[in-house]
């Protein structure tokens, strides 16, 4: 190879970063690639600049997807990593190869529809996902590499949270509430949620959109109310990675989030809230819209997590699970392998190996 290869990571949203970073750190071990993170301007630019500084990331900024497209066509990197669909890939593919690396393994149909606009390759997490995508898009290139986001935990590189810094008693058990933005359980929780679990530390790690988008203002109001309780920490927008909380928590409560799979894969108990706040046009005669949004994989959550069909049931089950000796069933492990693949800490290495072989 005559010159170093260039790889750009397109960071349209900050929460793409935990999926990219393990690959970037693996790339740094090779003397082949120059990497750069391309951030999109938005309301949290100052926060992102701090992340760039803390992680020592080589970075450029673009205004939006159209600006990013022009930038990529001008710079002509060898590879561009994307976390979602991207416009006019046919133009980009004249000069560059593209790789899609999704940020989660959740039950929404968007997991699969991201391949409606085919990249040069898409890295996927499990044999089941690989086979299904190959059936849906037989002309496209998929590589089953594993779930690289989890590599830092599996490899012992993730230290977890600082309990003292968060004002927590390390001797108390810790609950992680990690809801998604829609459909969400947030609005169905009691205003006294932290008081109902007063003997435990509670970390609330909402989706980035719940903390940033205007349409989820009511969610933020409730989240900030819960933050006022002494046993509760509300993750800030710059707490962009879920990994420290996955590492340190004893129990997760969630809803339609891929975090359920990530936490259960660590052989820890998960409560799956099936009581969701649906918009009026997703209820009653319009319930087909909710079903259309969620993939059939959503039904597998009941095999991995303990369903809670109401708020009161959730509180009761949370206490019971934290007071018991939990271990995942063999059946749950089979479903986890189906959705998240084998977690061996080597997914990032397999991605880099593919890149080395396809320079």
Positions of the model-derived regions?
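C-terminal alpha-helical cap of glycosyltransferases
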Residues: 343-359
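Conserved catalytic-core segment of nucleotide-activated headgroup transferases in glycan assembly
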Residues: 17-27, 31-36, 150-225, 235, ...
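Active-site and donor-binding regions of nucleotide-sugar-utilizing enzymes
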Residues: 8-157
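Short, conserved catalytic or adaptor-binding loops enriched in Gly and charged residues
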Residues: 50-54, 135, 221-230, 293-301
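A short, charged/proline- and glycine-enriched loop
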Residues: 1-7, 94-96, 169-173, 199-200
């Amino acid at each position: 190879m005559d010159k170093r290869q260039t790889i750009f990571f397109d960071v349209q949203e900050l929460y793409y970063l935990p999926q990219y970073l393990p690959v970037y750190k693996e790339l740094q071990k090779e003397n082949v690639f120059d990497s750069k993170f391309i951030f999109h301007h938005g309301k949290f630019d100052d926060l992102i600049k701090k992340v760039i500084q803390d992680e020592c990331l080589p970075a450029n900024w673009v205004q939006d997807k159209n600006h990013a497209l022009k930038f990529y066509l001008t710079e002509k990197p060898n590879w561009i990593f994307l976390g979602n669909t991207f416009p006019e890939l046919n133009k980009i593919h004249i000069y560059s190869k593209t790789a899609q690396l999704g940020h989660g393994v959740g039950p929404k149909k968007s997991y699969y529809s991201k391949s409606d606009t085919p990249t040069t390759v898409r890295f996927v997490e499990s044999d089941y996902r690989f086979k299904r995508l190959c059936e849906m898009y037989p002309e496209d290139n998929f590589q089953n590499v594993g779930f690289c986001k989890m590599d830092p935990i599996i490899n012992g590189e993730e230290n977890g949270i600082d309990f003292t810094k968060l004002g927590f008693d390390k001797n108390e058990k810790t609950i992680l509430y990690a809801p998604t933005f829609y459909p969400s359980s947030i609005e169905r929780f009691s205003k006294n949620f932290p008081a109902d679990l007063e003997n435990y530390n509670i970390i609330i790690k909402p989706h980035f959109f719940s903390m940033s988008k205007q349409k989820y203002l009511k969610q933020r109001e409730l989240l900030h109310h819960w933050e006022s309780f002494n046993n509760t920490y509300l993750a800030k927008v710059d707490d962009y990675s879920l990994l420290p909380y996955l590492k340190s928590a004893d129990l997760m409560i969630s809803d339609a989030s891929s975090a359920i799979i990530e936490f259960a894969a660590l052989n820890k108990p998960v409560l799956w809230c099936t009581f969701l706040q649906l918009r009026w046009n997703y209820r009653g005669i319009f319930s087909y819209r909710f079903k259309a949004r969620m993939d059939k994989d959503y039904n597998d959550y009941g095999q991995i997590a303990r369903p809670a069909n109401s708020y009161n049931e959730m509180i009761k089950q949370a206490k019971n699970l934290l007071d018991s000796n939990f271990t995942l069933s063999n059946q749950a492990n089979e479903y986890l392998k189906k959705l998240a693949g084998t977690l061996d800490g080597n997914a990032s290495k397999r991605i880099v190996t593919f890149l080395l072989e396809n320079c």
